[in-house]
A protein has these predicted regions:
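Terminal low-complexity/charged segments
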Residues: 1-198
Length: 198
């Protein structure tokens, strides 16, 4: 059951969605609304224009970048789905901007607009290998500087490439190749439970 505050949030979200569609419809190619959260789908080339407008416009005023999330859909051509989550403190809107890339397309850094993006984009590059153009300090943040590869990609080996361990006999850290090699993985995208659903 909806209480009155949820109805107001939903009504505000509807008004903002109408405003958004009228103003920035040339930048977006998809729209999805869930209660008081709006998700739009954009091209990577239009991203900076749209986010600059949404931050500086007095109606939208998305002044807080809460998080950047990446999903690796290895079966798609544009396998990485990047979602930026914004928050409007005044009107209490949650807002998601989604874009798709194959990892080689240009994704512009939003660190000039939102300072919280500095760490988030570094983490995405470290874990997924997606490079952000015009990011000033794109370097490793969660793995070692000599680490090879990006561990959250679906095609990264489960055991990694090297084994790092402390050798008590020589009192130092050793790096050795992984002794148990993993065979090439083939991904099955079929779901055995699909036959029970319509």
């Amino acid at each position: 059951m909806l209480n009155s505050s949820n109805i107001l949030l939903t009504q505000k979200t509807q008004y903002f969605t109408i405003f958004l569609i009228k103003i920035v419809k040339k930048f977006i190619y998809g729209l999805k609304i869930n209660q008081n959260q709006i998700n739009i789908y954009i091209n990577t080339t239009k991203m900076l224009y749209l986010l600059t407008f949404l931050k500086n416009n007095s109606i939208s005023n998305f002044d807080k970048l809460v998080d950047i999330v990446v999903v690796d859909n290895i079966s798609n051509i544009n396998r990485f789905e990047i979602t930026y989550f914004f928050w409007n403190m005044i009107y209490e809107y949650r807002f998601g901007v989604k874009l798709f890339t194959n990892g080689f397309n240009i994704v512009y850094s939003v660190s000039n607009l939102y300072k919280s993006a500095l760490w988030l984009e570094r983490e995405i590059w470290d874990m997924y290998g997606i490079k952000f153009l015009f990011h000033l300090g794109l370097r490793r943040i969660l793995t070692d500087y000599g680490f090879k590869g990006h561990p959250l990609r679906k095609d990264f080996p489960l055991l990694g490439y090297v084994d790092i361990y402390y050798d008590d006999s020589i009192q130092s850290i050793k790096v050795a190749p992984v002794e148990l090699t993993q065979s090439l993985r083939f991904f099955k995208f079929e779901n055995p439970w699909n036959k029970w659903y319509l």
